[in-house]
Amino acid sequence: WGQRDRIYRIMPYWGMTTGSLTDYLSAKGYETYAASVGPLSSAWDRACELYAQLAGTRTDYGVKHAQDFGHERYGIEYKQPLFDGWGTERAVNLVGHSFGGATTRLFLEILTNGCPEEVAAARAAGVEPSPFFLGGKGSWVHSLTAIAAPHNGTSFIECNADFTKAAAELA
């Protein structure tokens, strides 16, 4: 959760019970923000949500992705960007914890290289693709730091074989 979520006022993600890390860093003169992405969403959906917040636009999950996964193409509209001036001259330093690390890696990949499949699907549908899917904006990120991120998967299934087998049989 992030600063746009209600729970953040009670228990900020960065700092939780010890106080807000973003407030602490702000008091020290650092400009910090906590983006809000879906807690149970895919890395793709979360990357699209992060882009929309940084750009101050409507979340566009992509024509192809929405068709492939059976959900709406558009999500929340962010009328104001998380901060003004995001771009090459004002690049961000991303910090992602846990699945946020995987999310920010995918975000940077799409921001840098785009998604040709989404561009083609949008154009075939006669609509404009999101600027996010066009790529060419890798310089808009100065750095990416991942903390305890599952970049190489997880050992959960191996460690919980009986549990996962039972869950699969119930499905």
Each predicted region: which residue ranges?
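Serine-dependent carboxylesterase/thioesterase catalytic core
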Residues: 51, 58-171
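Active-site catalytic motif of lipid deacylating hydrolases and related acyltransferases
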Residues: 1-92
